[in-house]
Amino acid sequence: MSEAPSASAARSGRDLQSLRGFMRRLSTGMLIFSLGLGLGIYAQHRWPIGRWRDERASRPTVAGRTVAEIAQIPRERRLVILAVGQSNAANFGETKQTAGPGVYAFADGSLYAATDPLPGGNGYGGSIWTRLGARLHTAGDFDAVVLAVVARGSTRVTDWAPGGADHERLVATQKQLTAAGLPVDCILWQQGETEAGWADASGEAYFAALKEIISACRTASPDAKFVVAQATFGAASPSNGQISPAQTQAAALPGAMAGPDLDRLGSGFRSDGVHFNDRGLAAAADAWLAALRPWLTQRSTTLPR
């Protein structure tokens, strides 16, 4: 005997209700997974040192010399570098290195051994700066090289401009160095990959924000040279052609100069299409040194002795 129409309709209604409940649970699960994945990526790039993956990164080794001792070295025999930008300035390199004697990392008013990952960046790998510091010291021009890093992965130029999330830290670090008797000699800007990966990012807006950053740094560190690298390379995404010219334009501003063209270091120098592998870290340090050399030579002839 066939099932009554009313019973069949009731069963179909229950089946439909059950299916809808399953779909709601599935959608909720996918939403939670997506949120968790997004928060994980966000945290990897934005949480401060010591809060993600490796607790040892929060305990850098105290340097064998004090801030006061380094501050007593004549300025022509010491160099204070402030490195600013996104992940390629923030310890996201493939291999770690120790700069060795005579090179120091500055953070929160203290000096530490210049060992990757450097304090002030939110990555846990290697950096250009330990390698650059070692090259500068080995050349014999300086008795001490001080590296201060203020860098965070995935940041935009507007994050560093007045009103941005990282601007106060940028200015505060310069004030700390000045108060410690170690005024900044040069500010190395390595940022731009974020905007270069966005098709709708404006070169004009990038230049305007970077101009504000340079102006603020000139106020905080009047004698510092602001050095702008060409940094827009990303193998996985098409490059926005407006950003590199904006960096060139900013390098011509008063108090600024052109740094290295790191876009020449293509996929063979990258571990994942963006961040530097061991070969890339060495090549980037060499490129920074070559770009700084003419200015360093001029600086040595103009500083009071």
Predicted regions: what they are:
Residues 25-305:
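Cell-envelope and extracellular/periplasmic
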Residues 1-23:
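N-terminal Lys/Arg-rich, disordered targeting/topogenic segments
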